[in-house]
């Protein structure tokens, strides 16, 4: 199917929010893309893309940082949910590693600590669809943190569909459209036959009914 227009996306998003039953929490707005003629178990059919959403997610992702020294200090000052030093990393038990994986949406790791982070945190992060992100020692960690607060990991695991948040129900529909277009445009470039590999696009809130986007 061709990628939907801005108007088609907006119509579906407005309906998804409108038809969603009210809850006592802020619901996410989700984008679901069903694929066709793609084998998710093959290298060319496997999608794993980090995408930075230009209009944010309505609720920041929780960022944890593995670093020492100045980078650790800046990360703390910049509002990291948790900062783990090298010594603390090496002392983490499997239970502690699972707690980090549960608490943190993104784990940013100074590059010289990546090997240890992969060995210690990797087994806990992997099953949750999360990955440690390498950060060069000279990078501005606060800027990197701020970028990842609005980042999503788009992946299809072993199923021919992808599902991700594009924001929250209280966001401007125009902003949700821009986020959805950003994701769909990137996805189109990663599929073997582009938009021809897309069978269906659906939007919904956390607890609401699915609304199919007409393309």
From Swiss-Prot:
Ribosomal protein found in the keyword field: yes
Protein name: Large ribosomal subunit protein uL1
Cited Gene3D superfamilies: 3.30.190.20, 3.40.50.790
Top-level taxonomic group: Archaea
Record Pfam families: Ribosomal_L1 (PF00687)
Family annotation (SUPFAM superfamilies): Ribosomal protein L1
Family according to the record: Belongs to the universal ribosomal protein uL1 family.
Source organism per UniProt: Staphylothermus marinus (strain ATCC 43588 / DSM 3639 / JCM 9404 / F1)
CDD domains for the chain: Ribosomal_L1 (cd00403)
GO molecular function: rRNA binding; structural constituent of ribosome; tRNA binding
């Amino acid at each position: 199917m061709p990628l939907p227009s801005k108007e088609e996306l907006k119509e579906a998003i407005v309906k998804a929010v409108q038809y969603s039953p009210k809850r006592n929490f802020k619901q996410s707005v989700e984008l679901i893309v069903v694929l066709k003629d793609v084998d998710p178990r093959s290298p060319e059919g496997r999608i794993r893309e980090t995408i930075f959403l230009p209009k944010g997610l309505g609720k920041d992702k929780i960022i944890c940082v593995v670093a020492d020294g100045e980078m650790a200090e800046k990360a703390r000052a910049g509002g990291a949910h948790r900062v783990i030093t090298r010594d603390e990393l090496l002392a983490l038990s499997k239970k502690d590693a699972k707690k980090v994986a549960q608490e943190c949406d993104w784990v940013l790791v100074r590059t010289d600590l990546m090997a240890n982070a992969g060995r210690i945190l990797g087994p806990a992060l992997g099953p949750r669809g999360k990955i440690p992100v390498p950060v060069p020692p000279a990078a501005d960690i606060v800027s990197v943190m701020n970028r990842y607060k609005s980042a999503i990991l788009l992946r299809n695991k072993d199923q021919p569909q992808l599902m991700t948040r594009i924001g929250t129900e209280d966001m401007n529909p125009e902003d949700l459209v821009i986020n959805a277009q950003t994701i769909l445009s990137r996805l189109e470039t990663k599929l073997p036959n582009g938009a021809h590999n897309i069978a269906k696009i659906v939007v919904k809130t956390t607890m609401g009914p699915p609304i199919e986007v007409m393309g």
